[in-house]
């Protein structure tokens, strides 16, 4: 994709042309190819460069959040306006580099969606459009905590300060602007659609630079001198649904198999640097399907990732985490619970279609009422005998990793 040149005094003024690509299922993306001014109080970009005298005033609206296919959440995303109209505010803050604008509204605050709908699309967009990393992030609808929580990672993409739209009152001028984020699908970086054949492993490398200790191999960490591999059990804190009802018994069994166990209950205030250090230096991550398993991005190659899959979420479990694990060269195991291990059996009975044939209820989509049953009303009581076999396999793979790193 060819970018417009930065305007200089030796060049003719760059025409400010507004264009939008609305051909994609998951996202729209718009451009202002020349000088423009942002009025944050109205969420409007004004094209300020010369325009063709035969071209009428153009107004485009975009909701720059990459879930265009999901009408309900998109209805909650604010429109940004792009216009070539004649009434243009004066500029207070001048930038020599372009703007990349997107929304951190929608599902932001859910750790999975922070990555799936925000940070991974940001990686794709930056590598596709701004490979020199010389641009300003302008983020709309960001919660107050968002810029600080992800500051270390955001500064892997750009050295310039982040502009949060709702906290600004001054107008900002840019040589050109891109509005929207490119996504390749759920937790996906498609190497055929991105320059230099980048993949999710390159995104993981950026996570390591942001949160890890550079030039330190995990085996040099004192935690890896131990004889027992470390297993991190990700648990849902004060959450409705997908809890392990016999957690204490499971933990005792994990220890008997030969692991040291760390209970990981992340929340909105959990330090990403501390989380990265814990997960990256451990040998196994285990958890019931849910947002916390997004931390599997922090695992190093060869680590074991064991996902416990409740009834009815098989497709999501593979699309969100299974394919990711295989692509990141993790030792991926999945434990699909049986009917008797689901708490739903007590309410609906083992012969109910919800338990016996969940695919028949989802063949035309995932209605909210069905999704809520599987995700919010279902807990798991693991079959200790059957689950022990998976733990033994995880232990074997973890010991193999330890031997490789010594």
Where are these regions (language model features)?
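The feature primarily captures lumenal catalytic ectodomains
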Residues: 1-406
